[in-house]
Amino acid sequence: MENIMTLPKIKQVRAWFTGGATAEKGAGGGDYHDQGANHWIDDHIATPMSKYRDYEQSRQSFGINVLGTLVVEVEAENGQTGFAVSTAGEMGCFIVEKHLNRFIEGKCVSDIKLIHDQMLSATLYYSGSGGLVMNTISCVDLALWDLFGKVVGLPVYKLLGGAVRDEIQFYATGARPDLAKEMGFIGGKMPTHWGPHDGDAGIRKDAAMVADMREKCGEDFWLMLDCWMSQDVNYATKLAHACAPYNLKWIEECLPPQQYESYRELKRNAPVGMMVTSGEHHGTLQSFRTLSETGIDIMQPDVGWCGGLTTLVEIAAIAKSRGQLVVPHGSSVYSHHAVITFTNTPFSEFLMTSPDCSTMRPQFDPILLNEPVPVNGRIHKSVLDKPGFGVELNRDCNLKRPYSH
């Protein structure tokens, strides 16, 4: 009988945070909205709060960056560690150290699905349909996958069954698709700046932005709009048709997450050939099943918010069963290792975090070390050939551990 590798148990889980409401703004990291002044990501982008004039100019004005970065580290009995980052800050630390720890410590490093189900079941009474608790669970789940990969000496994508393509090709999200084209990306996604409270004038302004970028980028470069939950179905439908002459590839997250009937109506009324996409702020497997049933073209879960890699794999299966694409929202290496194994993810998103989109800055800078960025719009699978997720934690980021157990 052949010997089977003996896997260690998990000795301890620890949680830190950095940035957030108690820190100077601009920490970046897992909370990538937390950027300094004069950054495109905080420049009059339409949001659900834009209808209030006091909060329309800046997303930070209503507190988009108050949570900060959560760092979860799991240590095995043999001393090896895995870690991950997400957006949950100090409150996420409390959930990990005071509640979730009991489901993690003492388990085998391979017991990821068991731990995941126990975390979901135990928090159901206060987690609702996602949000902060799901961000925290996602971070733990990713840290467990990182540890498992390091213990067995394999990259996470090989733990999932291996790559189905040699490289990942990317589109860029940011304010300058024209610069993204020069960098080799296949497309550029811009934020909208106006919403229903601006009336038809807002539609004309955002459509003019698309027209300007179409002229700069040429006919074959993808252009998309990210509406960040800021619209209603009538406004979104009118905006989609206003942008149709400029070959807009898709219109994204026009509506709040739970407005499934409105998503179904938007898909039904959108211009022929224009895709409707959403999912970034959906936080449970069940919500993605319902979203899939609306008939949208692409589901866009964030692996750091939807329940982690364990849930992302299940979401991809739901999408595949309906002939839909799954293209995760940003998330750097945590997405890379997943999507290179998905047959229904022909491309992925790279979020431009440099202030003016003119340089290639890693998404989670400075919290991750050795975080890869696309070269000519692509990342080859060989770049991912390191144990776990292949990145290291930058412990010089003023990490604070407010709780212990």
Swiss-Prot record:
Site note Transition state stabilizer, residues: E349
Site (Increases basicity of active site His): D302
EC number, as in UniProt: 4.2.1.90
Single GO MF annotation: magnesium ion binding
SMART domains: MR_MLE (SM00922)
Top-level division of the source organism's lineage: Bacteria
Record: residues binding substrate: H33, R59, E349
PROSITE patterns assigned to the protein according to its UniProt record, in alphabetical order: MR_MLE_1
Cofactor entry: Mg(2+)
Other comments on record: Reaction proceeds via a syn dehydration.
Subunit architecture: Homooctamer; tetramer of dimers.
Name of protein: L-rhamnonate dehydratase
Organism classification: Bacteria, Pseudomonadati, Pseudomonadota, Gammaproteobacteria, Enterobacterales
Gene: rhmD
